Amino acid sequence: MNMLVALSVNIALSMCLITIAFWLPQLNMYTEKANPYECGFDPMSSARLPFSMKFFLVAITFLLFDLEIALLLPLPWAIQMNNINTMMLTSFILVSVLALGLAYEWMQKGLEWTE
């Protein structure tokens, strides 16, 4: 019986939230809400428009650093290894390569948005 009550409450709450989410955005629709904001491209315009090369380079740089940071995620589990010196040396080399890459990007003004 408790399972049936919990299921009924969950279904009723879900339907209520879905109904609110369906009707609420239509109440105050204005142009700023409909404009794209993430990358500056209008998704409804032509696909042949040129895009900013600076945005592309910053996006690729972010993607590379994000993937390299993902290599650091297993470090807490690597501490449990038998040879902790190897783990520390590997993590130090990885962080050093990241720092050198960041310094190089900074020196080449790859992180500056304005020229």
Curated annotation (Swiss-Prot):
It comes from Habromys lophurus. Core subunit of respiratory chain NADH dehydrogenase (Complex I) which is composed of 45 different subunits. Interacts with TMEM186. Interacts with TMEM242. It is found in: Mitochondrion inner membrane. It comes from the Eukaryota. Pfam families: Oxidored_q4. It catalyses: a ubiquinone + NADH + 5 H(+)(in) = a ubiquinol + NAD(+) + 4 H(+)(out). The chain crosses the membrane at residues 4-24, 55-75, 87-107. Keywords: Electron transport, Membrane, Mitochondrion, Mitochondrion inner membrane, NAD, Respiratory chain, Translocase, Transmembrane, Transmembrane helix, Transport, Ubiquinone. Core subunit of the mitochondrial membrane respiratory chain NADH dehydrogenase (Complex I) which catalyzes electron transfer from NADH through the respiratory chain, using ubiquinone as an electron acceptor. Essential for the catalytic activity of complex I. The gene is MT-ND3. This is NADH-ubiquinone oxidoreductase chain 3. InterPro entries: NADH_UbQ/plastoQ_OxRdtase_su3, NDAH_ubi_oxred_su3_sf. Belongs to the complex I subunit 3 family. It is an enzyme of class 7 (translocase). One of its GO terms (cellular component) is mitochondrial inner membrane. One of its GO terms (biological process) is mitochondrial electron transport, NADH to ubiquinone. Its EC number is 7.1.1.2. One of its GO terms (molecular function) is NADH dehydrogenase (ubiquinone) activity. It is a multi-pass membrane protein.
